[in-house]
Regions:
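A helix-coil-helix interface module used to build multimeric assemblies
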Residues: 1-119
């Protein structure tokens, strides 16, 4: 995105931080629907954190953005982190997270389209 042509609130949807936060939301939601994690595991998974810097540093080792993210998030969750990404593919997470980002962008843009004249 070219910053000078981007509304700040739209640009914020597409940052690395926002993208990885969407990944985190997908991973947490998937864990919440599994039968395996204990309530303690889920509590730790929900509380798990990441930083973009930590993920990028780990990516230097993994050569894979999602693998790096999963490693960082899982480590943050402790033993319960073993359930993060369990049964998922990278595409499962990436595609679903992208849909969340598109939805957020639409929620920002939509009110402005109502002000446009028809036709």
């Amino acid at each position: 995105m070219i910053e000078r042509y981007t509304r700040p609130e739209i640009g914020a949807v597409w940052t690395d931080e926002a993208r990885m936060e969407a990944w985190r939301q997908v991973e947490v939601a998937a864990c919440e629907e599994m039968d395996g994690p204990t309530p303690q595991d889920l509590e730790a998974i929900r509380a798990a954190t990441f930083t973009v810097e930590a993920v990028k540093e780990r990516e230097k080792v993994t050569d894979h953005d999602m693998a790096a993210f999963v490693d960082v998030l899982s480590a943050s969750a402790g033993p319960g982190g073993r359930w993060i990404h369990y049964g998922l593919t990278s595409s499962d997470v990436l595609d679903t997270a992208l849909a969340l980002q598109i939805k957020r962008a639409g929620e920002i843009i939509r009110p402005g389209t109502r002000a446009c004249p028809a036709g």
